[in-house]
């Protein structure tokens, strides 16, 4: 699969690095996508498209004491024949191809490693994602309102924080996650209570 990657050191102090890439991507339907009963679709096409991304990362710290690192990335993908499972009126789900999807957004990551004492270590990681995934295909019918809408079950925003406190062989882990609302219908309809999954924490 053709791909091009480039890194450039902006500053040795703080290890600031700019990164960029472009790639052509393919994904074939899985056996479940094709033959699962009921609902498999043997007529599915493979996904294919082009992805671009660029970003910057840094890392600072003091050996044996602490380190702090972070990264910000922008990405932009154009995918044809995106495979998505959708409910049917027959009571089961089936996969179908969406002619064109534009997925883009920003991802932020940061992490801290700190050793305050020989037997103690604290690690913390956090990330935030803004990931619109828009159906840009052709309408299936004249009344199709799914074009220009967010894909089903994909949250536009998500975030998580993980903390780990280690003392010798003991470890305490805490994880917090957030997901924004997700639509359950391809036209993002809010007419019924089951038209979306409300934002939630866990």
What residue spans do the PLM features occupy?
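Transmembrane beta-strand segments that form the barrel wall of outer-membrane beta-barrel proteins
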Residues: 1, 22, 37, 131, ...
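Membrane-embedded beta-barrel scaffold of Gram-negative outer-membrane proteins
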Residues: 9-11, 19-21, 27, 47-113, ...
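Hydrophobic, lipid-facing positions within transmembrane beta-strands of outer-membrane proteins
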Residues: 2-4, 18, 40-42, 50-54, ...
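Gram-negative outer-membrane beta-barrel transporters
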Residues: 67-78, 96-186
